[in-house]
């Protein structure tokens, strides 16, 4: 949530195997991030009597854009915000953005951050509001709880640089990734650093949450700096080694 007294709230809709569609609500309006499928999202919005104002697309993969076209049939005035470099792969975008663009939506300022690595032209959305207790990051598949996205199109150098960009944000930034991978990521990290108290404590905490049917997310940048081995890798060589190890690792 953006600030203790804010009327902004963010809600998870769990879909498919491990995707999370985040819904950002302000008064009677909503913004949806990376809708994998339309059904559960449309149902949730209609039950809450919310008007869909925009859809934020971080990248072109079907488990992130699969529900968009059906949602804009129900709410034709909703903007579809996506990278202007992805017109071919996200052809239904109606509000095209580029790296470092800033636009306003639902009484907040949103900055676009280009984060190559998982895919070319992947973007993240950084949301700030004056006098808010914290700011918010929707990183798509770039940054996860305790992890980062696989390198499907980009290089280790690109992902390392993208994580460096995100790591430069304020430490109280709340992070809303598009997948629930935190437990697996922390188990992997613990296999490399079995004595890391921060990872041990975080893993215990999120396992309790998951057992209660809760989400492990959002996390904070402060928390990721203590427990995310990818984010704190000292150099590209270390990052590359970690990414290759994680790609081969079995939980």
Curated annotation (Swiss-Prot):
NCBIfam families: GSH_gloB. SUPFAM superfamilies: Metallo-hydrolase/oxidoreductase (SSF56281). Belongs to the metallo-beta-lactamase superfamily. Glyoxalase II family. Pathway: Secondary metabolite metabolism; methylglyoxal degradation; (R)-lactate from methylglyoxal: step 2/2. GO terms for molecular function: hydroxyacylglutathione hydrolase activity; metal ion binding. Keywords: Hydrolase, Metal-binding, Zinc. GO terms for biological process: methylglyoxal catabolic process to D-lactate via S-lactoyl-glutathione. It catalyses: an S-(2-hydroxyacyl)glutathione + H2O = a 2-hydroxy carboxylate + glutathione + H(+). This is Hydroxyacylglutathione hydrolase. Its EC number is 3.1.2.6. Thiolesterase that catalyzes the hydrolysis of S-D-lactoyl-glutathione to form glutathione and D-lactic acid. Zn(2+) 2 binds at residues 63-64, 141, 179. CDD domains: hydroxyacylglutathione_hydrolase_MBL-fold. Pfam families: HAGH_C, Lactamase_B.
């Amino acid at each position: 949530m953006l600030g203790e007294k804010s009327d902004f709230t963010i809600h998870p809709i769990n879909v498919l195997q491990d995707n999370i569609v985040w819904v950002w609500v302000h008064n009677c309006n909503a913004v949806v991030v990376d809708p994998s499928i339309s059904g559960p999202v449309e149902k949730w919005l209609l039950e809450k009597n919310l008007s869909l104002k925009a859809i934020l697309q971080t990248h072109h993969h079907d488990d992130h854009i699969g529900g968009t076209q059906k949602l804009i049939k129900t709410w034709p005035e909703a903007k579809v915000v996506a990278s202007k470099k992805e017109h071919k792969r996200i052809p239904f975008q109606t509000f095209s953005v580029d790296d470092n663009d800033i636009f306003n939506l639902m009484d907040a300022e949103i900055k676009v951050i280009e984060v190559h690595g998982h895919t070319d032209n992947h973007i993240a959305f950084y949301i700030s509001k004056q006098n808010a207790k914290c700011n918010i990051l929707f990183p798509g598949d770039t940054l996860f709880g305790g992890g980062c996205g696989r390198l499907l199109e980009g290089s280790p150098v690109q992902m390392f640089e993208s994580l460096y960009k995100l790591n430069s944000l304020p430490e109280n930034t709340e992070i809303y990734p598009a997948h629930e991978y935190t437990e697996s990521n922390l188990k992997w990290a613990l296999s490399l650093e079995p004595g890391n108290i921060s990872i041990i404590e975080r893993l215990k905490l999120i396992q309790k949450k998951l057992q209660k049917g809760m989400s492990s997310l959002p996390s904070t940048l402060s928390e990721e700096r203590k427990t995310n081995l990818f984010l704190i890798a000292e150099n590209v060589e270390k990052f590359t080694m970690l990414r290759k190890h994680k790609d081969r690792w079995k939980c």
